[in-house]
Curated annotation (Swiss-Prot):
Protein name: Gamma-aminobutyric acid type B receptor subunit 1
Lineage: Eukaryota, Metazoa, Chordata, Craniata, Vertebrata
Effect on the protein upon substituting Y367A: Strongly reduces signaling via G-proteins. No effect on antagonist binding
Residue segments, region Disordered: 867-892, 909-961
Biological process, per Gene Ontology: adenylate cyclase-inhibiting G protein-coupled receptor signaling pathway; gamma-aminobutyric acid signaling pathway; negative regulation of cell population proliferation; negative regulation of dopamine secretion; negative regulation of epinephrine secretion; negative regulation of gamma-aminobutyric acid secretion; negative regulation of synaptic transmission; neuron-glial cell signaling
Length: 961
């Protein structure tokens, strides 16, 4: 993009600007050249779309010619834009021409003469072959290049071989696993024997020597291999090289071989640990390292967009080191191994763990016998199908899952169902091109020849896929020994002089092996610095019970060749994990609307009651009910009812940024509504209890109720709430929190899980604040119930509606005491919690308004008591007699006056009694006592008429009523 910006002024300049130029040039750049036929041009730094959008390229810009298929550029491969607007070497055209194989231009132990063309060999070129002395040509001596093909097979030079009876034997010690974890020896041993026959029949390779094989069955067991290694080393004849098969056996053999100066060449070992040259200094293998699978696996993960994988491995060094390498590679690619399981012999528990962890993309690393155990457990756990993809090793037998295995209890049909659709990555072990190898056989001819040699079907033969590697291993050894020995007649060492103390011959064999490069039946054979084979990777998929090739990957060039023949059970590659969709549980809108309508009607009712109370505040009956407190009750009910609206608001209506404000609105509206509504009723009942009860014991408390005390009490309750809420909001404000529930699996989509979430208003110390709030509110409710019960029999006109207040307190307290804990328990059920809380608010508000205000409305309407106090005093006597309030007031006044007179009379009586007692004592001192008269006491005088103010009990009792 930066390059395009820099070149934009050049590209946008009109073609005719800048003076006279040649038709294909401009002073500011060069015109784009058309690519040659069967070829193209590589524009460095530009994409294909960018190239289509421009016509000129800047000065000093270079283009490169490339050709398709088996063609090469003839002429300049690179051209550069000159300052004069022309390209370099325009007098020489660049063409893409078909070439013949370059392998015909060299001949081992001979010379090639090219006529009729230059290198590379073009159509019409001719080559003549000549062998060196002591060699003779096998095949045609001339070949002609025509349409990219040579007219005859490539010949080779054979040495004039020593007679067979005079050739010296060179022994190879081999360990073939005929059974065990990988029974690769079943096919690899016949392949090795084929290679020995072919090598020994050649006159140009080891003409003075004959390779012979001494072998044992290692059973892919290091313990068994140790026994046979001892026999190979300590029994004659001397072996010049060792050839193990399994990685576990190769690890043992290769680590010990250096002590006997032996080269180790393996045909079936893939353990990455064997690439350690310090630990295994003399080790080579024609089987590529298992780490060669990992770049292919990572490439496929990226192709299908997988970012999370799981692994299960058999606990052996080869698989552990392979998995360690895979972990490093996926980490570099931004892919995560979420779950890693291993097992020694029983994979049941690891497979269950994979199922429990919802693993989807699973890489399995284990031998063939363990693979059957794993997939039997996979079938039992249903860990297969369109949700899962398994990546396995590709060197199992093609029908490995159909082979009878007494260690598992799954049928062939069950195993076939479990393995369907899995992917294998396999080293290309058979040359896909039908070209002739150094043995003068094509790969197809090799397969046919080996199949005839085997005693059973190739699919039932272990190691059949690795057989080409074993065949090429013998050829690599033969060529290295041939180079070490001098190739017959030339200077070299005597192989028969080798012994376990002769490091010189070992070093020469090592150098010869390290420089190996030839075409084998498995492809081009070459070893890297660690002694491992370099090769392509074949990607296959099990489709309908048989493996189908779906691609190749060349890790050295990062080139993925895809055939687009992959098939998926679900129609497409599955997701690497269950897609978790977070969904919020919102309040039922029908419930919210219904309760909102009830709340709105309640607010209207509160406004009507408030208006009624204010309008009739001059009426004595309304005045005696403390109308201002009733007004506060109506306002409190309105605020509480208004709290229903923010209580039902959630993410369905508002954004997350507005949620804290809604939380505060809920808290303040409900808190202040309760304080005003319930606080004013509590104040009434408190003062009724304080002033108008226990009058016999505390008559001095019978005072006139002062209104300011009522308002002060309400103010104290509201102030406590305001202070508490303010501190709460400042110190630990409410905010939006998310409650997450268990995942839900929808039936219609297998790769999606629903993660329900619920929004809450909460704070860090939510439980502490609720404890404080509910604590003193609960005490007020309980105290209100107690006071309402204590004052139920009190009759007073100062607060004439205290019984209605008590009834309202009962209802509010019961609803609140039940609803508060229930809503806390049901907080995770948004509909139930909202229904309980909102309906409790609505019902308590409705009950309070109806109980307090409806009787007053009914009384004023039915009795017509709409007069004020001034109007009431101007009424006639009949009206006065009908006014119970006035009579009550007059009787109370008279009662107080009579009580004062009675107290004075009682004091006078007490004083007279004291005087009488004093006189009696004085008389008794002057005259002796005389017997009392039968009547006793003082002489009775005429009875006095009862005084109007005498302390008659019935009268006093009447006054106290």
């Amino acid at each position: 993009m930066l390059l395009l910006l820099l070149l934009a002024p050049l590209f946008l300049r009109p073609p005719g600007a800048g003076g006279a130029q040649t038709p294909n040039a401009t002073s500011e750049g060069c015109q784009i050249i058309h690519p040659p036929w069967e070829g193209g041009i590589r524009y460095r730094g530009l994409t294909r779309d960018q190239v289509k959008a421009i016509n000129f390229l800047p000065v000093d810009y270079e283009i490169e010619y490339v050709c398709r298929g088996e063609r090469e550029v003839v002429g300049p491969k690179v051209r550069k834009c000159l300052a004069n607007g022309s390209w370099t070497d325009m007098d020489t055209p660049s063409r893409c021409v078909r070439i013949c194989s370059k392998s015909y231009l060299t001949l081992e132990n001979g010379k090639v003469f090219l006529t009729g063309g230059d290198l590379p060999a073009l159509d019409g070129a001719r080559v003549d072959f000549r062998c060196d002395p002591d060699f003779h040509l096998v095949g045609s001596s001339r070949s002609i290049c025509s349409q990219g093909q040579w007219s005859t097979p490539k010949p080779h030079c054979q040495v004039n071989r020593t007679p067979h009876s005079e050739r010296r034997a060179v022994y190879i010690g081999a360990l073939f696993p005929m059974s065990g974890g990988w029974p690769g020896g079943q096919a690899c041993q016949p392949a090795v024997e084929m290679a020995l026959e072919d090598v020994n029949s050649r006159r140009d390779i080891l003409p003075d020597y004959e390779l012979k094989l001494i072998h044992h069955d290692s059973k892919c067991d290091p313990g068994q291999a140790t026994k046979y290694l001892y026999e190979l080393l300590y029994n004659d004849p001397i072996k010049i090289i060792l050839m193990p098969g399994c990685s576990s056996v190769s690890t043992l053999v290769a680590e010990a071989a250096r002590m006997w100066n032996l080269i180790v060449l393996s045909y079936g070992s893939s353990s990455p640990a064997l690439s350690n040259r310090q630990r295994f200094p003399t080790f080579f293998r024609t089987h590529p390292s298992a780490t060669l699978h990992n770049p292919t696996r990572v490439k496929l993960f990226e192709k299908w967009g997988w970012k999370k994988i799981a692994t299960i491995q058999q606990t052996t060094e080869v698989f552990t080191s392979t998995l360690d390498d895979l972990e490093e590679r996926v980490k570099e690619a931004g892919i995560e191994i979420t779950f890693r399981q291993s097992f020694f012999s029983d994979p049941a528990v690891p497979v269950k763990n994979l199922k429990r962890q919802d693993a989807r993309i699973i890489v399995g690393l284990f031998y063939e016998t363990e693979a059957r155990k794993v997939f039997c457990e996979v079938y039992k756990e249903r860990l297969f199908g369109k949700k899962y993809v398994w990546f396995l090793i590709g060197w199992y037998a093609d029908n490995w899952f159909k082979i009878y295995d007494p260690s598992i209890n799954c049928t062939v049909d069950e195993m076939t169902e479990a393995v369907e659709g899995h992917i294998t990555t396999e080293i290309v072990m058979l040359n896909p091109a039908n070209t002739r190898s150094i043995s003068n056989m094509t790969s197809q001819e090799f397969v046919e020849k080996l199949t005839k040699r085997l005693k059973r079907h190739p699919e039932e033969t272990g190691g059949f896929q690795e057989a080409p590697l074993a065949y090429d291993a013998i050829w690599a050894l033969a060529l290295a020994l041939n180079k070490t020995s001098g190739g017959g007649g030339r200077s070299g060492v005597r192989l028969e002089d080798f012994n376990y103390n002769n490091q010189t011959i070992t070093d020469q064999i090592y150098r010869a092996m390290n420089s190996s490069s030839f075409e084998g039946v498995s492809g081009h054979v070459v070893f890297d610095a660690s002694g491992s084979r370099m090769a392509w990777t074949l990607i296959e998929q099990l489709q309908g019970g048989s493996y189908k090739k779906i691609g190749y990957y060349d890790s050295t060039k990062d080139d993925l060749s895809w055939s687009k023949t992959d098939k998926w059970i679900g129609g497409s590659p599955p997701a690497d994990q269950t897609l978790v969709i977070k969904t919020f549980r919102f309040l039922s809108q029908k419930l919210f609307i219904s309760v909102s309508v009830l709340s709105s009607l309640g607010i209207v009712l509160a406004v009507v009651c408030l208006s009624f109370n204010i309008y009739n505040s001059h009426v004595r009956y309304i005045q005696n009910s403390q109308p201002n407190l009733n007004n506060l009750t109506a306002v409190g009910c309105s605020l509480a009812l208004a709290a229903v609206f923010p209580l039902g608001l959630d993410g369905y209506h508002i954004g997350r940024n507005q949620f804290p404000f809604v939380c505060q609105a809920r808290l303040w509206l409900l808190g202040l509504g309760f304080s005003l509504g319930y606080g004013s009723m509590f104040t009434k009942i408190w003062w009724v209890h304080t002033v108008f009860t226990k009058k016999e014991e505390k008559k001095e408390w019978r005072k006139t109720l002062e209104p300011w005390k009522l308002y002060a009490t309400v103010g104290l309750l509201v102030g406590m709430d305001v202070l508490t809420l303010a501190i709460w909001q400042i110190v630990d404000p409410l905010h939006r929190t998310i409650e997450t529930f268990a995942k839900e699996e929808p039936k219609e989509d297998i790769d999606v899980s629903i993660l329900p979430q619920l929004e809450h208003c909460s704070s860090r110390k939510m439980n502490t604040w609720l404890g404080i709030f509910y604590g003193y509110k609960g005490l007020l409710l309980l105290l209100g119930i107690f006071l309402a019960y204590e004052t139920k029999s009190v009759s007073t006109e100062k607060i004439n509606d205290h019984r209605a207040v008590g009834m309202a307190i009962y209802n509010v307290a019961v609803l609140c005491l039940i609803t508060a804990p229930v809503t806390m328990i049901l907080s995770s059920q948004q509909d139930a919690a909202f229904a309980f809380a909102s309906l409790a608010i609505v019902f308590s508000s409705y009950i309070t308004l109806v109980v307090l205000f409806v009787p007053k409305m009914r009384r004023l309407i039915t009795r017509g008591e709409w007069q004020s106090e001034a109007q009431d005093t101007m009424k006639t006597g009949s009206s006065t007699n009908n006014n119970e309030e006035e009579k009550s007031r007059l009787l109370e006044k008279e009662n107080r006056e009579l009580e004062k007179i009675i107290a004075e009379k009682e004091e006078r009586v007490s004083e007279l009694r004291h005087q009488l007692q004093s006189r009696q004592q004085l008389r008794s001192r002057r005259h002796p006592p005389t017997p009392p008269e039968p009547s006793g006491g003082l002489p009775r005088g005429p009875p006095e008429p009862p005084d109007r103010l005498s302390c008659d009990g019935s009268r006093v009792h009447l006054l106290y009523k």
